[in-house]
UniProtKB/Swiss-Prot annotation:
Keywords: Archaeal flagellum, Cell membrane, Membrane, Transmembrane, Transmembrane helix. One of its GO terms (cellular component) is plasma membrane. The chain crosses the membrane at residues 32-52, 53-73, 199-219, 225-245, 273-293, 302-322, 446-466, 498-518, 527-547. It is found in: Cell membrane; Archaeal flagellum. The keyword Ribonucleoprotein does not apply. This is Flagella accessory protein J. Pfam families: T2SSF. It comes from Methanocaldococcus jannaschii (strain ATCC 43067 / DSM 2661 / JAL-1 / JCM 10045 / NBRC 100440).
Length: 562
């Protein structure tokens, strides 16, 4: 196994010395320190559970080349659609093969790992004097992605057969896009797996939280201490799941990556600031009215509803962001039609880009029409073509439109045929949009699961708390000798309300992390998570209050319900 690990190091760009000194040695030292601390601080079953941590760290360090190689494979596959579209459209220009590879190797932001693979092809052909076919075969044996390796093998065979690069890449579009579609569908399957993982983890943590509420009646542990430990464990597990899912999901963002904020970005920030200001004003006022001055009707409101009401203004910024996100999706839906129409019009008029845009700007392309008119005005004023198209992509707020409109403009700039370029880009773009529809449906199911799970957590935790309060009231009403109290650990607990606040705090943590996770999985705008946070928090608050009300009636616990 050691030999296999060292054989993989060159493929992930590591020397054996760097691997041992930068990864294995720090992991080994950390594991030893953790093991020593474990033997000093813990014993029994807790020690065995704790020792899993240094073992995981050490195994991860040893298996780092496998992890890095798998990560490279995913990063290559997730950009295949961009690579084949850019490669195909640029191949119909006047660029020679070396210049084409050089351009691809410089697109680090757009192509990621595929830019590095293109750089290897460029170095092999330019510096080492290899033919493109030989370079493709050499790289196909070393790339971690089987899909990309198959593409390189097909390219090498076509070039050896005397086929033109342009003709091959135009025919290859459907094949590579089918490979990308298969990869995307596997990603959707992994989303289902992550949903199951999240539900299982949250169910287990809910059981642990419920157990931590009742265990002080059975074992000599402090009530508040157990609840606090459970809260931190809850937070740590949720955060770990988010990190794992974020690192495993392929890159598929919706929003643009422009450095300067667009009008839409400024609008969203304005509404976010308004929402935050309202929360800063409303939440302290509600708490002051209830707990300090006892102002009616706030003093009679349950604190769960009060907190949810205080955070509700955040939904304003989230709702505005959701509307803009839906508008971006509609823009992506009509973009292929616009580009195909533009390509046909420019080709028919013999290269009149400005006149074609003037004609198309009078047609209805939904929410994209405004951006098309701005593009026409920029080009009519003589602004640089590439810059105008780049600004068009940013104004659309769509990452896909940003990328593919830039590909189209560069193809035209280098002398490519507008009609052919538009056909390649629009066809591939349409396939990506169709794949995304499946993902959005999958995410909607996950949103329903998260909302329902929030209610389930609130029900389980506050039901357990109601039982704990009943037992506590029972012990308080009994005259038990002090000797028996110390033997059986049945002393009444005086800080039950603190534990209740800690439990509700765990539901707030769940609402925050779940809302963030939803946007990580769908790749949308992060501000929309505010709307999900408020919705989940309201569900948790309402279910918690109703559960507390029902438990108090069923078990006869005389506790204040507000």
């Amino acid at each position: 196994m050691v030999i296999v690990v060292f054989d993989l190091l060159p493929r992930v760009g590591l020397k054996p010395r760097d691997y041992l000194l930068r990864i294995v040695l720090p992991a080994l030292i950390t594991s030893i320190v953790l093991i020593l601390l474990g033997f000093m601080l813990f014993s029994g079953i807790i020690l065995y559970i704790y020792l899993l941590l240094p073992i995981i760290i050490l195994v991860s360090a040893i298996g780092y080349p496998y992890i890095a190689l798998d990560s490279q494979k995913n990063k290559i596959n997730e950009r295949l659609h961009i690579f084949i579209t850019k490669f195909g459209t640029l191949s119909i220009t006047d660029l020679n093969r070396k210049d084409l590879l050089k351009i691809l190797s410089e697109e680090r932001e757009e192509l990621g790992e595929l830019a590095k693979e293109s750089e290897k092809l460029y170095v092999l052909t330019d510096k080492w004097g290899r033919s493109l076919a030989e370079a493709c075969r050499f790289l196909a044996q070393r790339t971690p992605s089987s899909e990309f390796a198959d593409f390189l093998d097909r390219l090498a065979y076509a070039l050896d057969s005397g086929e033109e690069l342009k003709e091959f890449l135009i025919k290859e579009q459907d094949i590579v896009m089918d490979d990308y579609a298969a990869f995307y569908k596997r990603m959707l399957y992994s989303l289902d797996m992550y949903k199951e993982l999240y539900v299982s983890a949250m169910t287990s943590i809910a059981f642990f939280l419920a157990f931590s509420i009742l265990v002080p009646f059975l074992l000599p542990y402090n009530f508040v201490f157990m609840a606090t430990i459970a809260l931190f464990a809850f937070f740590a597990v949720e955060l770990l799941i988010v990190v794992v899912i974020r690192n495993r999901l392929p890159f598929d963002r919706l929003w643009h990556t422009g450095e300067k904020p667009t009008e839409t970005d400024i609008k969203l920030r304005k509404w976010l600031i308004i929402s935050v200001i309202l929360v800063v004003i409303l939440l302290p006022f509600l708490l002051w009215a209830k707990y300090i001055v006892g102002l009616s009707p706030f003093s009679q409101m349950p604190y769960m509803i009060l907190v949810a009401l205080g955070f509700t203004p955040l939904a304003i910024g989230g709702f505005v962001a959701l509307k803009e996100e839906e508008k971006v999706k509609r823009k992506e839906f009509v973009f292929p039609d616009f580009l195909r129409s533009l390509g046909d019009s420019v080709s028919a008029k013999g290269g009149g880009m400005v006149s074609s845009l003037e004609y198309l700007s009078n047609h209805d392309f939904g929410p994209l029409t405004h951006d098309i008119k701005r593009l026409y005005k920029r080009l009519a004023l003589g602004i640089d073509s590439n810059k105008s198209w780049r600004l068009f992509g940013f104004d659309s707020c769509s990452y896909l439109i940003q990328l593919f409109s830039d590909i189209f403009s560069r193809c035209i700039y280098f002398g490519g045929d507008p009609k052919t370029a538009a056909e390649i880009i629009s066809k591939n773009f349409r396939k990506i949009v169709q794949l995304r529809k499946s993902k959005y449906q999958n995410i909607q199911q996950f949103v329903g699961v998260v909302y329902g799970l929030g209610g389930g957590l609130a029900l389980a935790l506050f039901a357990s708390l109601g039982v704990a309060k009943m037992i506590n009231d029972l012990y308080s009403s009994l005259s038990i000798p002090e000797t028996v109290i110390h033997i059986l650990n049945i002393a009444p607990i005086s800080n039950v309300d603190v534990v209740e606040y800690i439990i509700f705090g765990s539901l707030i943590v769940y609402s925050i992390i779940s809302a963030i996770l939803i946007k990580i999985m769908d790749g949308g705008h992060k501000f929309v998570s505010l709307l999900h946070f408020v919705a989940i928090l309201w569900i948790c608050a309402i279910v918690a209050y109703i559960t507390k009300l029902i438990v108090s009636q069923v078990l006869g616990v005389s506790v204040p319900l507000y």
